Structure formats: C-alpha cells, structure tokens
Amino acid sequence: MSVRLWDKGGATDAQMLRYTSRDDWQLDQRLLAYDLRATIAHVRGLARIGVLSEAERDALVRELEVLSAQNEAGELRLTEDDEDGHSAIEAALVARIGDAGKKVHTGRSRNDQVLVATRLYERDALDELAENAAAGARALLDLARREAETPMPGYTHLQRAVPSSVGYWAASFVEGLADAIDVVRATRALVDRCPLGGAAGFGVNLPLDRVGVARELGFAGVALNPLASQTSRGIIEAQILAAAWQVMAVSRRLAWDLSLFAMSELAFIRLPEAFTTGSSIMPQKRNPDVVELMRAACSVVQGALAEVQSIVALPSGYHRDLQLTKGPTMRGLDEALATSRLLPRLVEGLAFDRERMARAITPECFATDRAVELAVEGVPFREAYRKVAAEIAALPAGDAAASLRARVSLGAPGNLALDDLARRLDRHAR
C-alpha cells in the first residue's frame, strides 16, 4: 500500500477515502506513463538547480525508467489503496532507493503533477483524433473522385429536391471533417503549454527551470501563471470535448445518411457485410448497428462536454470538484477515437446501387433547373418560379448527368474542387 502524499499520520475515515478517491486510481493507470515521463523531467530540472545531486538524479531517473518499462509491459498496476498514480510513484521510489525518493516531490504539487500528465495524454489523443479524421476525410475524398459523376437525388427536409451526385455528397463530409480538424489542431495548440512548476497554483520558492522541463517534455511553451493553469483545468477539457464533438457531429450526419440510404425502401447504399450484424430471431436481417452506434456516440461526447462544463463553475484556485473532469474527458475522447478509427474502413467498403439512385431522380427534381433556365431566357425569376410550380405535374423527365454538368460554380456538383480539398487535407498531414 502506498503512503498517501498528503497523509500526516492521523486517522482517516476509510469510507470517506473511498468516496473521495472514487475511480481515480483506475483513470490514473491510463495516465501513469505520462506521469512517469513528467517526473523524469522534473527530477532533471531539480538537479539543474541543485536540489538533487547528480547521483540522486541518476538513481531516480534509472528507477523511473524501470517503472516506465514495467508499466509499458503491464506489470505496474495501481490498486485502490494507492489512491492515485502520484502516491504510487513516490512509494515505489522510496521503497527502491530510500531517501532520494522522498525528494522527488520537491517544488511540485499533485495539482500541477496531474495537470501535466493530463495535458500530455490530451495532446496525444488530439493528435490521433486529427489523424483519424484526416484518414476518414481522405477515404471520402477517394469516394468523391470515384463517384464524381454518379447521380443521386439531393434531399432537403428529407424530401427529394434536386439532382445531386455521390461525389458531391461525399465531398460535403470531406470539407466538414477538414473544418473539424482545424478545430482539433487549434485546441491542440491550446493544450501544448506546460503547467509543471506551478505547484499548488501559486508558484514555489525555488528557481525551477520551467522552460527546460517544458522543452524536455516537448511542449511548445510554458503556461505562465500557475493560478491560470489551475483554473484552466476543466475549461481546457471542455474545449477538447467541443473539438471532439465537432468531429463526431460530422460523423453522426454521415451515419444518419448511411442509415437512411441503406434502408430497404431506398437501398441506395449497401454497407459492407462485415460491418453489419444479425437478428437473433429473424434470419434475413443485416442490421446497420455500426452506424446507429456512431450516431449515439456523438451524444456521449456531447454529454461528457456538458458534464465538464457544469463542474467548472468554480471560484479561483484548485477545488477537488476538478477531479471529476477526468472521467468524462477520457470517456468522450474514447468515443471520438473509437468512431474516427472505424470511419475510413466503413467508407471504403460502401457500395452504391446506381440504377436505384437514378430512378429516384423523378421529373419534379428538375423543377429548379427549369425555373433557372426560364430566368436565363429573360423571365423574371419569381415569375419563372410560379410558372414551373403550376406545371409540376407536366414536367418531363430530365437528364441528371446534364443537370450536374451545368452546375459549374465553385464547389457545385459540376465543379467539385476536389483538388482544393485534397490540398487542404495535405496541410494537415504530419
């Protein structure tokens, strides 16, 4: 059992401890690699200002690297008795190298210790989310290129509206994901400032090498004001979840479309068989569970965001409430990462029924084209609109391919500007 870092030797109620620790030790298992990495940087920083000798530094770094290897191998497991990863790390160091282990927390609080570990974790998660979203966008871009001229009906209010194309539909998701990636990258830049060295939120009477420690951990800079760092906890997490939500909102719209287009009454799209499930009683069923759960996953992220936003309505300084932002942040990121990992493979396996989509482009879908044609001939548009509306039933079948080719304004079905979208995605490549 670890000695809790705040324990002064008095009796502590066991039920209260369980209530305040909650599942923090389990969440800290996921942060342990980052906590160990930040502790190594902190130890080297302490040695640079003379708090630790070279021998103490080397012994501590050596043992921390051993702990890191054990953690990576799955051999370093936290328990409820540890309370959190911070106590477990210090206890392990004290057990292995004695008094030098007791010096590791000099100039540091659990407040900035958890902040830096969390920021390192969040930075990696945002990097993966951006990469996954870009992979999904590239799969959709490939689809848009392959099916650029494949007609399908375009819908508004879930009613047939105008001729569209699979390429145009797919390109809308490419641009939506590109926007979301911009938000994720901007959020990543916000996270990329090192809070370590702020202690409990008011600095410490040591000349800590905050810049050197930040550099060793790969941060772009230092979060300057320790109180601002402490009060950013939860606010930064809300921004992270908002960025994840934007990726998920685009994925949810795609999932909704796939769900509708795959239903038997439309059957425009066939999901890859490996991405469907069955019924326990109806032998014929191929259920699109994956897209249904993709829709719901967006709500999970949105719920996590609302949870964090509610928790952070606090005055300045650290408050234990902030511990409870860790769970929803991880839960929301887990959902976003799981969904974004799956997206490219799902898109790559889609099959389209061109004949069914073509048949669904009925004569009334060409009403707007006809009104515009009359306007070009000199009829005021509002008069043309009313004339066509009065003659809807008599509209002849149109040429969907010609309709698409005629819409040549930038980004329209006849001018998808896919190379522009590709260049935008290339700028996100790491």
UniProtKB/Swiss-Prot annotation:
The keyword Amino-acid biosynthesis applies. Its main location: cytoplasm. Keywords: Amino-acid biosynthesis, Arginine biosynthesis, Cytoplasm, Lyase. GO terms for molecular function: argininosuccinate lyase activity. CDD domains: Argininosuccinate_lyase. It holds the Pfam family Lyase_1. One of its GO terms (biological process) is L-arginine biosynthetic process. Transmembrane segments: none annotated. InterPro entries: Argininosuccinate_lyase, Fumarase/histidase_N, Fumarate_lyase_CS, Fumarate_lyase_fam, Fumarate_lyase_N, L-Aspartase-like. Its EC number is 4.3.2.1. It catalyses: 2-(N(omega)-L-arginino)succinate = fumarate + L-arginine. It is found in: Cytoplasm. It comes from the Bacteria. GO terms for cellular component: cytosol. Pathway: Amino-acid biosynthesis; L-arginine biosynthesis; L-arginine from L-ornithine and carbamoyl phosphate: step 3/3. NCBIfam families: argH (TIGR00838). Belongs to the lyase 1 family. Argininosuccinate lyase subfamily. This is Argininosuccinate lyase. The lineage of its organism: Bacteria, Pseudomonadati, Myxococcota, Polyangia, Polyangiales. The gene is argH.
